Amino acid sequence: MRVFLFYISFILLLFSLESCYKEEVIFNVEANNFLELPLILRINNKDCAFDYSQNTLRYPIEKDSIINFEAFIEFQGYSEVIFNNHSLKNNLINNLGEIRTNKQYEIKISTNNTAKVLKLRFTNLPIVQLITASRIYDEPKSLARFVINFPNQNTISSYVGIEQRGGWATLQLPKKSYSFSFLNSTFLDEKTPYSVFDLEQNTDWVLDGMYTDNTRLRNKIASNIWKAIPGEKHYGISPNFVELYLNNEHQGLYCLSENINAELLLLLNEDALLYKAIGWTGPDCFETSSDDLPSIERWDGWVQKYPNPNQRINWKPLADLRNLIVESSDEDFILQIGTFIDIDNFIDYYLFLNLICAKDNLAKNIFLTKQSLIDRFTIIPWDFDNSFGSSGIQPIVNNNLYKRLSELNPNNFNKRLKDRWIFLRIEAFKESNLLSIIKKSSNQIQKSNIIEIENEKWATIINLETEHANLMLWIVDRLNTMDNYYQNL
């Protein structure tokens, strides 16, 4: 009898606790064991993202406005939800009337005698939610759930291993950038390739915070310009704007893109190579050479990204290139440089980095790759924060490789450089095309109030209209500078 009474009392206690819990909706709670947050409001099978400090909800839509927006609505079953003074029906299609981006709507959620008023805004940008039970560090990676709600595609949800991204200076910024890998389980070593934004599948991805770029455009438009140059070997990333939430905190505007790795470049040959320059030092600028080759993944300001350093280290092809550039006689340089590098690719790279004044990309912000040992090196740019006049108007820039190419003129380098500039000015570098690339990206992030959120979250005073207008004036002026230079080459 006592045992029976004990169980009855225990059940009543649980019921009482559950009833107390249902007296109000708990908003800012930790994720469950599956790294999921509790339901607040779901529209057409996509959870609205919630910011606890601002009491706001956000939801992505494809168009700037929708008349008679009919949507399947879900919320916690013991609550009442009022949208714009209209009571919503749970687990049914509701007509929300006309909705538009950049307009605030009131949501009132009531449970018994408690109520909370939230502000709902619609955005044209995809929304990424990172849900984690632990802090995200520089390294090692932490486990998180990655959820992305698109305006016009199905939701993607997956476990990821995530860490902060960048060098020492970047890691000190208040707004963090992240690198992450998709996982097929909760084990951090079980990586799996994934496709986002209909891009090719990749295991490794980047969320770029763009904190030091007041235009919030430089990396995206530079990548678009580089990939618009006609040619077979213009490898690069395809950044896409997203809004990022870390649990229940809006982090602002980010660019989501693939990482430059063997998957992106389709490096299948066991003799393929991928090196990444990581420092503004003599070796990176091809100012010095060395035959002291280590058996580790880092050497003289470079990192071997492929082959996997745990399996094989191969610095000799890079050492041979450096020795040719730094140590060779003029005659040997003229005869051999065309067998070491893809001249056409390096010409396009030189024109591109001078067009956008990407001085950093002379050294640390580059990748060198080749598909096999008999192939020639091609060059890949990345990270364009310091470009498009961010350091003021700059003259035509060089490193030691380009100085020797210009001075010694192997393979008729200077004429090919000038002819290529004239050709690219017809289409890829046409003023209207470059301005169109800027305007398209600018329009994407000015349709919603995302910069207001950025300014409030990170205590900045960015005016996108002014920044983007100045950027377009700068590119027009830069084209004139480049035209004058190549006319006299």
Range-by-range predicted roles:
Residues 1-4:
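Positively charged n-region of N-terminal signal peptides that target proteins for export
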